[in-house]
Amino acid sequence: EFRRVLFRSNNDLSINTQRMPDFATSVQYNWNSSSHVKLGAIVRSMTYSSNVHEKAYSATGFGLQASTTFNITKKLQAFGQFNYGKGIGSYLNDLSNLNVDIVPDPDNEGKMQVLPMLGWYAGLQYNLCPSIFISGTYSLSRLYSENGYPSENPESYRKGQYLVANAFWNVSSNLQVGVEYLRGWRTDFSSATRHANRLNMLVQYSF
């Protein structure tokens, strides 16, 4: 799969047309209709041009993923996912908005690097009855520093956390209503932290 590389460049660096697609593989084990464990991996080669060295280079990224969902009781279900890798920002929710698949290397002029990053979430869903359920989820996305990054912008994003609680009611086969509360935190490399709250409501009619 050819995927657009999200990057942070400068006047000395630019992203080329990619020479190779991203290669992904996965395997899944199911032990009933609503429970499974899935493992996945991805490798990607990202090509860029250096005006300093007047040549093209490639940086290799990789990612590992594990996810699961399973019943604890007849009404209670657990779910979660864990991702770790380098240069996979475009595949991770919060990080996909930051253009950090590949970034300039402050310690090597005219070169770019892939940074370690992770993202995970875990949650529970409780089915009050066949038409009503409530759920809660916690998630974390984190970008790690290497080779002095981000020396020019310490206010850059380092970590984001979300806590979500919601409830949904399938009023009929056509009508669903729901409400959700979300609290989010952002921490920068400078350790500055901000937070926000959001309340969402949903009415959906299918026909």
Regions found by a protein language model. Give the residues of each.
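Conserved active-site loop/cleft motifs that coordinate metal ions or position small ligands
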Residues: 134-137, 166-182
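A glycine-biased, small/acidic residue-tolerant capping/turn segment at secondary-structure junctions
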Residues: 147-149, 178-179, 189-195
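Outer-membrane beta-barrel "beta-signal"
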Residues: 70, 169-171, 195-207
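Detector for outer-membrane/organellar transmembrane beta-barrel domains
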Residues: 30-153, 157
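Short, small-residue-biased leader/transition segments that mark boundaries at the very start
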Residues: 1-6
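Residues that define the transmembrane beta-barrel architecture of outer-membrane proteins
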Residues: 19-23, 58-64, 114-118, 158-163, ...
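Outer-membrane beta-barrel architecture
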Residues: 26-28, 65-67, 123, 166, ...
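Flexible, glycine/proline-enriched loop segments at strand-loop-helix junctions
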Residues: 10-16
